């Protein structure tokens, strides 16, 4: 490098080179071009008469050699060139999406259901939809009963008779369980969700009826699904295992159906267990069946005392069906009589013949008449002779005899099977033979048609029971008439998740009007009333289906009396809802919330493993609350999220859904605990008073225990606060021996209209101004109900307490007696009266039913005694070698009980537990002398203190109840003077 060409800093200072000259020429050319444009006008257009020769030269010659940078090259046509000038195109940057939202969302299809696109049926979809429009040809029923009594398999039999499919796998001899649509239901071998199907069934005259049937779970933990199903049904089909008889959930289903004013028909299922398992002779099988029916009737009679007289079940009346879902057959006495008439070709009065096939009726073959007395030399009852003996013959010969004898027996019954059929295994052959002999379930359909009312016939009773509005409204009249042209009213009780679990479809029953796709409806929640319309949204119905368990039939409208699955309205629905026309101007009232026959007393706290995923878990908990009718999810003051359920299996199912379906996050679960209640066992030791903050008002109150059984009557709806004073007075005076003045001075139940606490105005008109008391009544009631909802011991509900207002000083000026003054004061005085009445904790207690062999009974006693449980009865199960042990067990002691029980009985005992009642926990929760030692079991008398302290800790409260919080200063002075009071230690 020559040093003369560069300066000391390395900059070139030599002669001009060629490349610099070129760049200078380009700059000059640009300047000339700009100058030329300015001469031709500011907008770049050629001036009049101006020459364009120079520009043409530049474009034609020099632009061909111009270097174009890669980013300036035009590889593709513009959007305007492709789509035209009339189309607006937008280019969006990926940065405009939030970070948590992927640019391309993956298709979210969670496999939690077993489904098919469509299923061929023996009748067309148009025929099924046509039947929906005729309420007289529709029957809405729910299959209810105990666990493993065959409800789902019985449903399989009906599905097989209406669809081009087989629900029985002949290779592995397992049933499809068509209505167990969830994968975990198939794995656990129990039903978890209630699932509907609409089947077209023929009666014995080949007339078709649309039977909307809801298959419900039999496990007592999932009885909330049964409650939701019975609300939509016009009748209950009670499925009972012939061998096991009436069990705990059978009893509860009977009671629940009667409380809902639903007629009951019975299917005695698994009759073949009497033949193949118990090996009972036909006569003993009859005794067993008769005993089962008698027990059912006893329960119906016992439950009918509060709901009015209901017809008892009787096979001769046609409301009992005998069946075996596993073998695929069913019959009633009437259908069996018709089979005899057809087989022998004899003209007879089928109903009279059927009425003689049950009870102590004998057939005298010599005179060919039926009599109450047995023939000379003895004989079997008609049911045994004409029904059980042929049934036993079919079973015994198919299972154990030679092919020839089976052929002969079936030929006598008018059935011929192919040679290939006889090569089948025993179970498939038995199914084929029985289904050929007994035919379709026409007897079952006859029973539904005769004993279950149609939607129109049942409408008045259903609406009276579930609708909260008055009877003199046009809506009520339309619902009673099932008027398709009336105002729309739909009761929603179930929500089913879509395949991606992001939203839900809602399932309900149309009572009046016609629900159509594209229709705008008002969605009224459980908190809606014409006075308070906050819980109301307007949504558009986007799709409607007939829900068929594993597939759906799309429809454009749903007439009154039909069950329908609805898309697009679920956003604001939590449990149940009422749908009505968005344009309807009259006052609309809602359908009542579901009244469950059990309580969610088991709770557990949850939190995400990764704290940043808390919003996902909270959203998942919201969906859990939608999916499970009885599940309660709430946030404690400490910030922990708790889930309340009916038992361990219920919570296990919830947690599985939360982790895998609704939140898809890892969730940590705390040890399960139980809900408690707070109560008193004595009257308040002194009159407790509290002054309002402005010192202008003073309320004096005492607390005392309620009469035994009264809390249960209030909760079960036997007595209602909505009754007039005369009705209330008569009820309390006759049943609980209250004086008329006290009975008519009841102000409220708490913490709600069916709460197990009572507030009475026990003031004297001569001492207290009645007008002023009435002016502040609502505020005092609100304070009482607030206090009853969260008691002073550990923020648990108060139960079984009667609060009496014995004195009050109310300011005459409305300004000084506002709700802000009265509500907190009423709550505080209720707490102080409660604390002075010897407070106690109450814990929930399970009723436990255990099936066991007799040699395991002793071990069961031992296991129960370790957990503070006690046996109430142990009796043999009639006709079986098993024993039924009935016991009570505190819920807090029940965790792990089933595992413990099976361990000590080598897996031979099986138990089911369901909430039964509340019991007082031993010990005084306010006894500070009790020292709780970590990692040591507390003595029985220390349990109340232990439960209270640990519950308060878990909720983030101080360990002890503070007297300063609930007692006024003047009250504290008065308390200090009563030095003999046992609870001074609390101050």
Curated annotation (Swiss-Prot):
Its quaternary organisation is: Interacts with BRR2A and PRP8A.
State the encoding gene: CLO
What is this organism's lineage? Eukaryota, Viridiplantae, Streptophyta, Embryophyta, Tracheophyta
> Region (G3): which ranges?
215-218
Q: Where is this region: G1?
A: 145-152
Do you know which InterPro entries this protein is assigned to? EFG_III/V, EFG_V-like, EFTu-like_2, EFTUD2_N, P-loop_NTPase, Ribosomal_Su5_D2-typ_SF, Ribsml_uS5_D2-typ_fold_subgr, Small_GTP-bd
Quick one: where's region G2? 189-193
Pfam family of the protein (one): GTP_EFTU_D2
Extra remark beyond the main annotation:
This protein was named 'VAJRA', because the shape of flower buds when ready to open resemble VAJRA, an instrument used in esoteric Buddhism.
What's the protein here called? Answer: 110 kDa U5 small nuclear ribonucleoprotein component CLO
Any one Gene Ontology cellular component term annotated for this protein: nuclear speck
Phenotype when inactivated? Gametophytic lethality due to female gametophyte defect, when homozygous.
Ranges of residues in domain tr-type G: 136-422
Q: Which family does it belong to?
A: Belongs to the TRAFAC class translation factor GTPase superfamily. Classic translation factor GTPase family.
């Amino acid at each position: 490098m020559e040093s003369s060409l560069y300066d000391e800093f390395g900059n070139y200072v030599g002669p001009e080179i060629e490349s610099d000259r070129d760049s200078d020429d380009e700059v000059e050319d640009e300047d000339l071009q700009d100058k030329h444009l300015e001469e031709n006008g500011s907008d770049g257009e050629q001036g009049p008469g101006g020459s364009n020769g120079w520009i043409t030269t530049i474009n034609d010659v020099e632009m061909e050699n111009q270097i174009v940078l890669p980013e300036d090259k035009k590889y593709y046509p513009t959007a305007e060139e492709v789509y035209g000038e009339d189309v607006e195109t937008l280019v969006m940057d990926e940065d405009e999406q939030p970070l948590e939202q992927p640019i391309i969302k993956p298709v979210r299809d969670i496999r939690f259901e077993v489904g098919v696109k469509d299923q061929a049926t023996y009748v067309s979809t148009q025929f099924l939809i046509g039947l929906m429009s005729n309420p007289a040809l529709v029957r809405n029923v729910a299959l209810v009963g105990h666990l493993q009594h065959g409800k789902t398999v019985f449903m399989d039999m009906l599905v097989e008779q209406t669809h081009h499919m087989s629900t029985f796998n002949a290779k592995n001899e397992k049933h499809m369980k068509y209505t167990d649509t969830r994968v975990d239901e198939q794995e656990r071998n129990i039903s978890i969700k209630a699932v509907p199907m609409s089947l077209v069934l023929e009666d014995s005259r080949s007339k078709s009826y649309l039977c909307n049937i809801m298959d419900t779970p039999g496990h007592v933990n999932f009885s909330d699904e049964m409650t939701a199903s019975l609300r939509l049904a016009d009748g209950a089909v009670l499925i009972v295992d012939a061998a096991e008889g009436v069990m705990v959930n059978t009893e509860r289903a009977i009671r629940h159906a009667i409380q809902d004013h639903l007629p009951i028909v019975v299917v005695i299922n698994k009759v073949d267990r009497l033949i193949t398992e118990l090996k009972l002779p036909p006569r003993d099988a009859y005794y067993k069946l008769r005993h089962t029916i008698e027990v059912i009737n006893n329960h119906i009679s016992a439950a009918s005392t509060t709901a009015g007289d209901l017809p008892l079940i009787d096979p001769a009346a046609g409301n009992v069906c005998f069946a075996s879902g596993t073998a695929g057959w069913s019959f009633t006495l009437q259908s069996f009589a018709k089979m005899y008439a057809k087989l022998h070709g004899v003209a007879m009065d089928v109903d009279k013949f059927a009425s003689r096939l049950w009870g102590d009726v004998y057939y005298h073959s010599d005179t060919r008449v039926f009599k109450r007395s047995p023939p000379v030399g003895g004989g079997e009852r008609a049911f045994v002779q004409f029904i059980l003996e042929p049934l036993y013959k079919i079973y015994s010969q198919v299972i154990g005899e030679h092919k020839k004898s089976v052929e002969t027996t079936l030929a006598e019954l008018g059935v011929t099977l192919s040679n290939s059929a006889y090569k089948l295994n025993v179970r498939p052959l038995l199914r084929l033979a029985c289904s050929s002999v007994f035919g379709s379930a026409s007897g079952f359909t006859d029973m539904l048609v005769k004993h279950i009312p149609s939607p129109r016939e049942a409408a008045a009773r259903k609406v009276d029971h579930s609708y909260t509005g008055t009877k003199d409204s046009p809506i009520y009249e339309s619902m009673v008439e099932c008027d398709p042209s009336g105002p729309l009213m739909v009761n929603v009780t179930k929500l089913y998740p879509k395949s991606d679990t992001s939203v839900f479809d809602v399932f309900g029953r149309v009572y009046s009007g016609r629900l159509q796709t594209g229709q705008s409806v008002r969605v009224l929640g459980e908190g809606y009333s014409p006075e308070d319309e906050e819980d109301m949204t307007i949504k558009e119905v986007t799709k409607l289906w007939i829900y068929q368990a594993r597939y759906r039939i799309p429809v454009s409208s749903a007439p009154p009396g039909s069950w329908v699955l609805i898309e697009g309205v679920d956003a604001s629905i939590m449990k149940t809802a009422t749908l009505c026309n968005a344009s309807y101007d009259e006052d609309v009232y809602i359908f009542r919330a579901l009244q469950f026959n059990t309580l969610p007393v088991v709770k557990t706290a949850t939190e995400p493993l990764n704290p940043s995923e808390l919003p996902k878990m909270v959203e998942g908990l919201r969906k859990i609350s939608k999916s499970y009718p009885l599940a309660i999810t709430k946030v404690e003051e400490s910030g922990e999220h708790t889930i309340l359920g009916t038992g361990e299996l219920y919570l296990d199912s919830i947690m599985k859904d939360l982790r895998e379906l609704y939140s898809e996050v890892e969730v940590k679960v705390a040890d399960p605990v139980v809900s408690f209640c707070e109560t008193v066992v004595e009257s308040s030791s002194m009159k407790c008073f509290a002054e309002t903050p402005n010192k202008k008002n003073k309320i004096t109150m005492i607390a005392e225990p309620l009469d035994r059984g009264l809390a249960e009557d209030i909760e079960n709806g036997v007595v209602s606060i909505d009754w007039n004073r005369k009705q209330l007075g008569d009820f309390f005076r006759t049943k609980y021996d209250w004086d008329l003045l006290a009975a008519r001075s009841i102000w409220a139940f708490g913490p709600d209209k069916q709460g197990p606490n009572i507030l009475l105005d026990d003031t004297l008109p001569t001492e207290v101004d009645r007008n002023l008391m009435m002016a502040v009544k609502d505020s005092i009631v609100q304070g009482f109900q607030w206090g009853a909802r969260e008691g002073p011991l550990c923020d648990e509900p108060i139960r079984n307490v009667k609060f009496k207002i014995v004195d009050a000083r109310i300011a005459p000026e409305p300004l000084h007696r506002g709700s802000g003054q009265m509500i907190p004061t009423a709550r505080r005085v209720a707490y102080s009266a409660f604390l002075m009445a010897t407070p106690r904790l109450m814990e929930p207690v399970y009723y436990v039913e255990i099936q066991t062999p007799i040699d395991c009974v002793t071990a069961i006693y031992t296991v129960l005694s370790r957990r503070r449980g006690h046996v109430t009865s142990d009796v043999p199960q009639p006709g079986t070698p098993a024993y039924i042990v009935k016991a009570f067990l505190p819920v807090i002691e029940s965790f792990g009980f089933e595992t413990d029980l099976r361990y000590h009985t080598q897996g031979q005992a099986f138990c089911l537990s369901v909430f039964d009642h509340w019991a007082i926990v031993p010990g005084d929760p306010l006894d500070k002398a009790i020292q709780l030692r970590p990692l040591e079991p507390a003595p029985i008398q220390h349990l109340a203190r232990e439960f209270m302290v640990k519950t308060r800790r878990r909720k983030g409260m101080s360990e002890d109840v503070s007297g300063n919080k609930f007692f006024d200063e003047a009250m504290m002075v008065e308390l200090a003077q009563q030095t003999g009071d046992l609870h001074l230690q609390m101050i």
